[in-house]
Amino acid sequence: MIFINIDITNSFMKEAVPLARQMEGDWIARMKIALNSVIINHYLNLPLTIENVNELLRKGVSYRRICKHYGIGRKDIEKLRQSSVV
């Protein structure tokens, strides 16, 4: 599991609050959606590693989106996951 320090958490919140204000509905639901979106974008901007892939999958990002973003195939992700197991 990847731990995020307080500075990164604060920057996530600074990005998520304006995004949540643009949405409609319950504030807690809007913040949850906005914060997840900001965190997913953060991990997508990091280089491709097995830890980042696992964290993206834990956050609910599909294999298709990960493959499309990094320009790789699903088999490449499986190879990456297999190499980390060995």
From Swiss-Prot:
Domain of life (superkingdom): Bacteria
Official protein name in the record: Uncharacterized protein YdzL
